[in-house]
Amino acid sequence: MGRKWNNIKEKKAQKDKNTSRIYAKFGKEIYVAAKSGEPDPESNQNLRLVLERAKTYNVPRNIIDRAIDKAKGSDDENYDNLRYEGFGPNGSMLIVDALTNNVNRTASDVRAAFGKNGGNMGVSGSVSYMFDHTATFAFEGKSADEILEVLMEQDLDVRDVVDDGNLTIVYAEPDQFAQVQDALRQDGVEDFQVAEFEMLPQNDIQLSDEDKATLEGLIDALEDLEDVQNVYHNVDLDS
């Protein structure tokens, strides 16, 4: 569970740094979700899920409203979801998810970030087979045993429920996101530290301090790109 817990800590840390970048990325994602269907979360499941995730990052209401209003208007900006896979130092693997209105620009920017920061791009499928697409929830106030019983009563067979420090963490199938979150809310969970879709590595690796510094520079360069939404990797940065 080490890598998964590190991933939770990284998600929590992201909330405390560069919030304007996080808000901008959610604004784009909310716009795309609202544009793809009705701009109402009650009738648009994709929009509802994005808004639920945005809550855990405290995305301001005005940013959410602006994105939805833009989707309601005559704006016809089209975005594509893209995934890039690549390698960092000494066997480290990275997945980069992007949302872009200019595929050529994004591909060039991502390739340059890899090349200038000790990494190299891979082909589609070269890395992703070592990761699992997962719905992840983290919250306080309930034990893993309590939550497991609640989920079993709802016939929700999730991947894992663990206690770690003061948090309880639930790992579920991606298509269980809404059902699991609803079940947790019904049991009294109101505040989620994490409620996200993630690509979790099946195994984590350890790097030397020098290689970790190189990897962190690569991650920062990728996350700073306007079109990049998420960067996942298979390294235990706390070891």
Curated annotation (Swiss-Prot):
It is found in: Cytoplasm. Its main location: cytoplasm. SUPFAM superfamilies: YebC-like. Keywords: Cytoplasm, DNA-binding, Transcription, Transcription regulation. GO terms for biological process: regulation of DNA-templated transcription. GO terms for molecular function: DNA binding. InterPro entries: Integrase-like_N, TACO1_YebC-like_2nd/3rd_dom, TACO1_YebC_N, Transcrip_reg_TACO1-like, Transcrip_reg_TACO1-like_dom3, Transcrip_reg_TACO1_YeeN, YebC-like. Pfam families: TACO1_YebC_N (PF20772), Transcrip_reg (PF01709). The keyword Thylakoid does not apply. GO terms for cellular component: cytosol. The keyword Protease does not apply. PANTHER family: TRANSLATIONAL ACTIVATOR OF CYTOCHROME C OXIDASE 1. Belongs to the TACO1 family. YeeN subfamily. This is Probable transcriptional regulatory protein Sca_0317. The lineage of its organism: Bacteria, Bacillati, Bacillota, Bacilli, Bacillales.
